[in-house]
Amino acid sequence: MIQEFQIQNFFSIRERQTLSFLPTNDDKMRSQYLYEVAEGVELLKIGIVYGSNASGKTTLLDALAFFRRTMLYKPENKNMGMGYVPFLLDNHSRKEHSSMQMTFWLNREKYILSLEFDEKRIYEEMLMVYTSSRPTKLYSRSYQQETDHSEVTFGSKSGINKATQRAIAGNTTNNCTVMAAFGQSNAATSRLNAVAEYFYSGMRDTLSPRDSLTFNVKDELRHDKEDKKKRFLLQMLKASDFNITDLSLDESEESITPEMEKTIKSAPIPEEAKVEMLRRGTLKHDEILFQHTGDGGEYTLHERLESAGTHRFLGMSVVLYYVLHHNNFIPIDEVETSIHYELLSYFIKLFLANSEGSSQLLMTTHDINLLNEDYIRRDVVWFTDKSREGATQLKRLSSLGLHKTMNPYHAYKQGKLVDLPFLGSIYLDKED
């Protein structure tokens, strides 16, 4: 589980901003909201981020995705850039280093992984573990300007032999993290394996409002041999009053014609996929069929006839299945996209009531109705706000001094929590 994430000098973020899943001493629904990662240490399972347009909500999720990506993937060549921009709205930030640091827990041990970089290279990287009250270094790297290379050193507790250490150090180019280089090595099992596995399968890609979740649903139905996930999805749809009684996946194949072969060869898809399609000589088609109860019986509708809201909630139900059955961290941007507020609230309640593991959800949203709900703890709510210089500031509701008797929804509407977007006159000068 993630305890804390710090970001500095990344897109709209200039000064160091910290997102924390450490709870306050609020007693509200502790058993639903908190998970014990070690004796005496509990972390929040959920985070909700509000903010006006262009205030930096998505930047926060992008920073997490960037951090995960740099820990997993080695650049194609050593001359590739880091793939980001620093804060650009002043004369000095673009010349300074950026930094990120994540504190997280695995197997009841606390890890701290930090990174300092710019657009061209990584300057510092360190991974520490707390097996006691004192930190132990697993590895560190530093950039040597004189020789233009990164020096990597491993701690005695890393569990990695000297030969593997040399191989990892040799693969750690200036634009590649030690973790990504480790992922390319044939190393024996160590604590680094657990860290790499967390970034690979524990943290998931951000779900954006542009993502079609229908592909996820089809993939789950295709591999659902015992219909467990299908029953879960139908249970969700029934409870949400969608009038859908069954789901099925209609699959078919079509032979590739010479004209289709030309289209495939020029299509923006991976070469491996093109080769496999042409080798097979057929294209696979699949479509979800929805069975509804109507006047006089059961009726089947093709997926293209279902609403965007139905598809989105079905996809969100797949997400819910995963966080309930696997220990995942899943970021969701604009979680309210295409679904009614009551369904959004129901989704959150379902997660809180049924989550027994260490899964976490981090959601951004524009829907302020959640601020009016009694079941939402104040320490899970965050706001992104812009300074006069255009820099994103991350503020926690529980730290804003709002009296416990005051409704956060009304305080937000009155501009007592963060600045609301300034809207000009509704009358336009039509002569311009």
Positions of predicted regions on the chain:
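Electropositive, glycine-dotted interaction segments
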Residues: 112-258
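Pre-Walker A-like glycine/lysine-rich segment at the N-terminus of P-loop NTPase domains
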Residues: 2-66, 432
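Conserved catalytic network of the ASCE P-loop NTPase/AAA+ motor domain
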Residues: 41-42, 93-95, 105-108, 321-324, ...
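Short alpha-helix of the ABC ATPase nucleotide-binding domain corresponding to the H-loop/switch region
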Residues: 340-345
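Conserved ABC ATPase signature
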Residues: 46-49, 263-321, 329, 335-339
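Conserved Walker B
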Residues: 10, 334-339, 368
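Conserved P-loop NTP-binding catalytic core
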Residues: 34-48, 52, 61-122
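C-terminal lobe/lid and adjacent interdomain/linker elements of RecA-like ASCE P-loop ATPase modules
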Residues: 1-4, 346-432
